């Protein structure tokens, strides 16, 4: 399965991320595109929110795969859209369990 196949499912309002999580875990390019959808902040809600749903599951199962995106994800916490701010907080929470670089200290100081 590739990103285009996943993206075809984004148009539904009852999106289930589960069928796509393993692909995102296994395929770095798919995962990167999904993260880009989330952090870009310009996409239609179905695209960024459904991408977020997949990425959240990836972060829950294997947070190491998303940890390198910490700064890009956290940058959303100042976004004008409250969904983006909420996504930033939610994903960072998933990454705290492996915060070996102690990146959360900078957030606590904010």
Segment roles from a protein language model:
Residues 2, 17-24:
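Basic/polar, acidic-poor N-terminal "presequence/leader" segments
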Residues 2-4, 27-39, 63-76, 98-110:
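Amphipathic alpha-helical scaffolding segments comprising HEAT/armadillo-like alpha-solenoid repeats
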Residues 20-23, 57, 98:
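Surface-exposed cleft-lining segments at the edges of enzyme active sites
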Residues 42-44, 80-82:
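Short inter-helical turns and helix N-cap capping residues of alpha-solenoid HEAT/ARM repeat scaffolds
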Residues 56, 93-94:
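Structural signature of alpha-helical solenoid repeat scaffolds
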């Amino acid at each position: 399965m590739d990103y285009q196949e996943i993206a075809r499912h984004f148009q539904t309002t009852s999106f289930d991320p589960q069928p796509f999580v393993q692909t995102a875990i296994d395929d770095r390019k798919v995962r990167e595109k999904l993260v880009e959808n989330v952090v870009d902040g310009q996409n239609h809600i179905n695209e960024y929110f459904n991408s977020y749903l997949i990425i959240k599951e990836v972060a829950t199962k294997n947070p190491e795969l998303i940890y390198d995106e910490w700064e890009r994800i956290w940058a959303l916490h100042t976004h004008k859209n409250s969904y983006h701010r909420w996504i930033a907080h939610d994903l960072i929470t998933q990454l705290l369990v492996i915060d070996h670089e102690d990146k959360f200290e900078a957030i606590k100081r904010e």
